[in-house]
UniProtKB/Swiss-Prot annotation:
Pfam families attached to this UniProt entry: Porphobil_deam, Porphobil_deamC
Catalytic activity: 4 porphobilinogen + H2O = hydroxymethylbilane + 4 NH4(+)
Species of the source: Prochlorococcus marinus (strain MIT 9303)
UniProt KW keywords: Chlorophyll biosynthesis, Porphyrin biosynthesis, Transferase
Cellular component terms (Gene Ontology): cytoplasm
PROSITE patterns registered for this protein in UniProt: PORPHOBILINOGEN_DEAM (PS00533)
Family membership: Belongs to the HMBS family.
Subunit structure: Monomer.
Protein's UniProt name: Porphobilinogen deaminase
A GO biological process held by the record: protoporphyrinogen IX biosynthetic process
Superkingdom, natural source: Bacteria
Pathway as given in its UniProt record: Porphyrin-containing compound metabolism; protoporphyrin-IX biosynthesis; coproporphyrinogen-III from 5-aminolevulinate: step 2/4; Porphyrin-containing compound metabolism; chlorophyll biosynthesis
Cofactor note: Binds 1 dipyrromethane group covalently.
GO molecular function: hydroxymethylbilane synthase activity
Amino acid sequence: MVLTQLRIASRRSQLAMVQTNWVQAELEQAHPGLSISVEAMATQGDKILDVALAKIGDKGLFTKELEAQMLIGRADIAVHSLKDLPTNLPEGLMLGCVTEREDPADALVVNQKNAEHQLDTLPEGAIVGTSSLRRLAQLRHHYPHLVFKDVRGNVITRLEKLDAGNYDCLILAAAGLTRLGFGDRIHQLIPSEISLHAVGQGALGIECVEGHPEVLEVIKALEHKPTAQRCLAERALLRELEGGCQVPIGVNSRIEANELLLTGMVASLDGKRLIRDQQRGPIDRCEAIGKELAETLKSQGAGEILAEIFAAVRPEA
């Protein structure tokens, strides 16, 4: 069966639409004659801006509404920032494609007052804006003299708050800034020795309905195998730790020759306890490598740390 029409579900935020429009353009180029439409919508995570993400809960915070459209037959695929896509998907849906990864690093963005500073030179009491518990925990571990403040809203709103003086700096994903045309605002790429990135950060995940090989065949044109292999290991680690998108679990992955090197981290919210380790193995065992590293981290106390965090940030009723 040759697919002639494809319906995409997308978040309607500016970054999400930039990403979805890129996917649409790439698919149209790969499949001339394919008619593609986009339905944009707000998700729960887009609507609730006055509560910290971890307090809302992270079960499909930015994905559930898109998945509902596929499950009722109103969309064929959904485009996600892969870091927002839970590791356990609803029955009947699958991760069909992972695109080539942009730089997954976290980035320091400063206002004019702090233009001369790097992360290491920010003065005591400097206010750092982040909505990520992962970034918060790692930076608290390395920079306990800084003050951390939650920041919500889209990237443009966050930059406006920074430039208005509400924060001295922000920590944002370099990939998102670049895709939105704000690459010039990246003041410093934070080394992985300081901040391991989120699982899947920098890659797009295309989710689709199971049992539709014609859709899978179309979207596989955008698959980047090395990125998919790395993210398979990262997502296996996250799934095995029973973590979610909003907990302080960080990763870094590299492919060297035919081997995958995976680094993982779990930290307490105050940053005082940080467990970090590595696992290496053949690239055809990438999922097993993720699971094995998770077990190693658990043996060092990661499970206890995560249990405390889940209790502390239990979603509000």
